[in-house]
């Protein structure tokens, strides 16, 4: 062994002795180099994300205009984690979570950990404690804009607090990013949008909380309403566009379109009709939809209703779509303890 190799081996042993086993290794030595993911609860979004869902141990930002479906998208992710036996937590800084609606989306509200903090510091300290426990699989913070620094709450109404929230987020993310990776927790920050004053060219929209979240996020998801869905004259939901603005685990800028129905969330059956038609799994002739020579209905809404009434057909179409895109079957159990080490967070 050359002197250089011997010196390197000695340095590696010293590092492992000081910081623990696994603190440094060759990249090819890791047991599984693929990024572990959890389904977003929407097959269309899973495809757009590229890897089949949200990456575990990463920070995700979901942002968009008011009432666009940001919280709905996040609650579907929570429901998916709970279905696989994982633990979920929701930090409701906006104090606006509707338990009845969450329950309709499939969230087990009896098992969901909920915190409604008074200040931004309190919210982020609770988030850090939950992540460092290593026992929470998904954590949603709703929203970054509502994480008000303590100094602002205790100050007068007209006081200027320039940059306080950005500094708070920057410090929190520096502490959270490493712990999130070790605990394999998915941390979703919901964010609002604001407009920059005096922008003549380019997009005037920005998100509150400074630039730190943009840098630390592995996935940034933009949620926007495209059009209203009507049943006769009644508006029953929204056609919603989901754009993957940033993606560190797959090619970015892919888009997904989903139906978000009022009181029901993302319409799985609408997704199956759209994706099935694109792949010619579901055939469309004029206004009629059919599958395996069996007519599903005239018009998209009637075809959706057929899927609702015939879950066996829906399951078969979903299986074929997932096979085509190489996605993991939702029913496969996830080992949430895989890759976690109870000694990682020991002081």
UniProtKB/Swiss-Prot annotation:
Major location (coarse): cytoplasm
Swiss-Prot/TrEMBL GO biological process terms: DNA recombination; DNA repair; SOS response
Binding site residues for ATP: 64-71
GO cellular component, one term: cytosol
Similarity comment: Belongs to the RecA family.
Record PANTHER family: MITOCHONDRIAL DNA REPAIR PROTEIN RECA HOMOLOG-RELATED (PTHR45900:SF1), RECA (PTHR45900)
NCBIfam families: tigrfam_recA
Protein name per the record: Protein RecA
Organism (species): Exiguobacterium sibiricum (strain DSM 17290 / CCUG 55495 / CIP 109462 / JCM 13490 / 255-15)
Gene: recA
């Amino acid at each position: 062994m050359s002197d250089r190799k011997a010196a390197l081996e000695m340095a590696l042993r010293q590092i492992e002795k000081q910081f623990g086993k696994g603190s440094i290794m060759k990249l090819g030595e890791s047991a599984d180099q693929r990024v572990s993911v959890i389904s977003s609860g929407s097959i269309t979004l899973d495809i757009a994300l590229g890897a089949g869902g949200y990456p575990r141990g990463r920070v995700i930002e979901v942002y968009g205009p008011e009432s666009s479906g940001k919280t709905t998208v996040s609650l579907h992710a929570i429901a998916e984690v709970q279905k696989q036996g994982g633990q979920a937590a929701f930090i409701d800084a906006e104090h606006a979570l509707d338990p009845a609606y969450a329950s309709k989306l499939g969230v087990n509200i009896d098992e969901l950990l909920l915190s409604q903090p008074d200040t931004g510091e309190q919210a982020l300290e609770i988030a850090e404690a939950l992540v460092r426990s290593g026992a929470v699989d998904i954590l949603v913070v709703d929203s970054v804009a509502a994480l008000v620094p303590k100094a602002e709450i205790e100050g007068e109404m007209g006081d200027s607090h320039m940059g306080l929230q950005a500094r708070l987020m920057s410090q929190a993310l520096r502490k959270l990013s490493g712990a999130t990776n070790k605990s394999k927790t998915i941390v979703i920050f919901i964010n609002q949008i604001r407009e920059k004053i005096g922008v003549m060219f380019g997009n005037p929209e920005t998100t509150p909380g400074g630039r730190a979240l943009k840098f630390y996020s592995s996935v940034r998801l933009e949620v926007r309403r495209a059009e209203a869905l009507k049943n006769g004259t009644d508006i029953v939901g929204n056609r919603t566009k989901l754009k993957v603005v940033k993606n560190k685990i797959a090619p970015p800028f892919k888009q997904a379109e989903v139906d978000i129905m009022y009181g029901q969330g993302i319409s799985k059956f609408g997704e199956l009709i759209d994706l099935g038609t694109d792949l010619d799994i579901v055939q469309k002739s004029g206004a009629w939809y059919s599958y395996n020579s069996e007519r599903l209905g005239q018009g998209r809404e009637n075809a959706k209703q057929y899927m609702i009434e015939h879950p066996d057909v829906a399951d078969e179409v979903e299986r074929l779509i997932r096979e085509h895109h190489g996605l993991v079957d939702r029913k496969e159990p996830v080992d949430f303890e895989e890759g976690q080490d109870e000694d990682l967070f020991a002081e």
